[in-house]
């Protein structure tokens, strides 16, 4: 199933007037918990409820990125359980992981901010350093 991720993200950003994945999850009734995990995060669909779990050892900025990624799974792949493993997920060619990454970076790096960087002629590497997001995610965002 193909998703128009830009349109979907825009819908939720406008509906809830935020790009904060924690607020959007709250508004959608998606429960999340931060605790000790062996991986960065995971999304689970159990007994018709959606849950996101985040690793407590991640810095807040990375928790927000992982939350946005898992929120992407919750919205785009509602009934599939997914685990976020940093070093592998960003390199996987899995359609679901790529879509969740696109959802996350589309949500966290809106057009107006990205366009400011482009107009100022920042390189992808510079945008990654400024925003704190992986360079591969910035590249993925620019392809959107």
Positions of PLM-derived features:
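Active-site hotspot residues in diverse enzymes, especially metal/ion-binding acidic/histidine motifs
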Residues: 1-144
């Amino acid at each position: 199933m193909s998703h128009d991720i830009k349109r979907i993200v825009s819908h939720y950003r406008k509906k809830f007037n935020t790009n904060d994945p924690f607020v959007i999850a709250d508004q959608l009734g998606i429960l999340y918990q931060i605790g000790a995990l062996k991986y960065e995060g995971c999304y689970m669909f159990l007994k018709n409820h959606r849950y996101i779990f985040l690793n407590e050892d991640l810095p807040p900025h990375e928790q927000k990125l992982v939350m946005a990624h898992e929120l992407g799974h919750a919205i785009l792949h509602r009934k599939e359980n997914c685990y976020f493993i940093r070093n592998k997920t960003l390199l996987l060619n899995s359609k679901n992981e790529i879509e969740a990454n696109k959802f996350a970076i589309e949500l966290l790096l809106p057009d107006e901010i990205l366009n400011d960087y482009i107009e100022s002629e920042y390189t992808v590497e510079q945008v990654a350093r400024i925003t704190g997001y992986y360079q591969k995610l910035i590249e993925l965002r620019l392809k959107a």
